[in-house]
Amino acid sequence: MTIALGKFTKDENDLFDIMDDWLRRDRFVFVGWSGLLLFPCAYFAIGGWFTGTTFVTSWYTHGLASSYLEGCNFLTAAVSTPANSLAHSLLLLWGPEAQGDFTRWCQLGGLWTFVALHGAFGLIGFMLRQFELARSVQLRPYNAIAFSGPIAVFVSVFLIYPLGQSGWFFAPSFGVAAIFRFILFFQGFHNWTLNPFHMMGVAGVLGAALLCAIHGATVENTLFEDGDGANTFRAFNPTQAEETYSMVTANRFWSQIFGVAFSNKRWLHFFMLFVPVTGLWMSALGVVGLALNLRAYDFVSQEIRAAEDPEFETFYTKNILLNEGIRAWMAAQDQPHENLIFPEEVLPRGNAL
């Protein structure tokens, strides 16, 4: 058996090398291979959202006004989901629904699928950008791993949930008030606030906010070296080797406050990474469960007792009645094509109605 030893030489003008050199060149805004996915998708998603909220009505899909042109403001404008009758169609501009007619495509809700899909790939491109840059400067990829949390939430809410339902119609529209309405829908139809995955998500997000506040305050509290500049931004160089705050002092302070404290910075910062990312992932898993119509906690014994005993009521049974009211109102409004009719006596009444 003969083994040939030698150096493999590539053509210096290889197209891949030329592309790689240009894409990863050191410039003010890094492009990279990930930029081929990120920049076009982000441009189209943001541009589609601005176009929809400025000009496009939701009259044909939801019976609503949803654009600045119709009198909405920033909080009430939205890019609305397609009609329920269009199910899970990708609503391509050249597809059988719009047949290349841009106006009809907008009327049918084509901008929603356009923004949702380009937005999802844009977020993935941003995560890949963090991977690529981390690899280039020999960092660990934890930034990209952390960003997987928001991606998981976006994909589960805007794509997986409506895929589990009858159509894109049941996804959130892209607007502030529209997403508020979607949250009310989630509560009324899925009792989302009593879902353990939602509870873990809330604990993760609020816990992360608490950790950030404590961490920032502690670092500021334990500063021991002042610079000559007028403020913090001018006084210290970001490339300085020495630290200007005391981990030992911070450790002693929190040991006295709680009885326990983080013993080193690695564990502290890993915990600050772990809490919010795990919370977001748990929320995403919960929404995937809702796509399959899995139920939250049901305390049936309390419901039965409340039905039998007029004097027995809990916060849980009151919330169940509230959910029934939400369903009774929203189903008839949001799904007029179903011809849902509720007798007057079962509809909730209050001071505002």
UniProtKB/Swiss-Prot annotation:
The residues that the entry says bind pheophytin a are 130, 143
Q: Which residues bind Fe cation?
A: 215, 269
**Residues found modified as N-acetylthreonine:** 2
Gene Ontology cellular component terms for the protein in this record = chloroplast thylakoid membrane; photosystem II
Q: Which GO terms describe its molecular function?
A: chlorophyll binding; electron transporter, transferring electrons within the cyclic electron transport pathway of photosynthesis activity; iron ion binding; oxygen evolving activity
Q: Which family does it belong to?
A: Belongs to the reaction center PufL/M/PsbA/D family.
- Identification of the protein by name: Photosystem II D2 protein
What organism does this protein naturally occur in? Carica papaya (Papaya)
Provide the organism lineage as a comma list: Eukaryota, Viridiplantae, Streptophyta, Embryophyta, Tracheophyta
